[in-house]
Amino acid sequence: APTGSGKTLAAFLAAIDTLVCEGIEHGLTDETHVVYVSPLKALSNDIQKNLELPIAGIRAELERLGLPDVDIRTMVRTGDTPQADRASMRRRPPHIVVTTPESLYILLTSASGRKMLATTRTVIVDEIHAIAPNKRGAHLALSLERLQALAGRELVRIGLSATQKPIGEIAKFLTGADAQCTIVDTGHIRERDLAIELP
């Protein structure tokens, strides 16, 4: 889908819906459910901020309907994350962790990181076209397999890109060559206004 079309929020919707339903039903536990991986630290910070508004809107609607409050917590974990925030994540894991491929690897190598990530259900890899074809992609593919082994369940894996072709190859990268997956391609084609002028 094209840039600015809401791919990232759409990717989060099912996971957020599950968290809200669980929260209403019996309250949310302090467990990480979603890991969002971005190739850029700046994008990670933007995503966390961009999630705050929809989550606040959901909480306001729950209050209006007289339903229990569901406080979905998000935190960024990159190389720039202050030690105080890292300690906070260890004490009380966020429901959504926003990170980079390198920081995901580091989390998977520490006991506290593995404990936090063991409850993961969904992984969202944004701007996958920027990661897949290089060493970072190979590194991330290994981290995704390690995360799935740690979680002990099939993870929902979502890859997002505005430009990736062929999509099938990226699907294999994200899920493994033999895994079943669904590819959603909006088929967006930009209109072109071309003219040929001969002198």
Locations of the language-model features?
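Conserved P-loop/Walker A NTP-binding site and adjacent catalytic elements of P-loop NTPases
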Residues: 1-199
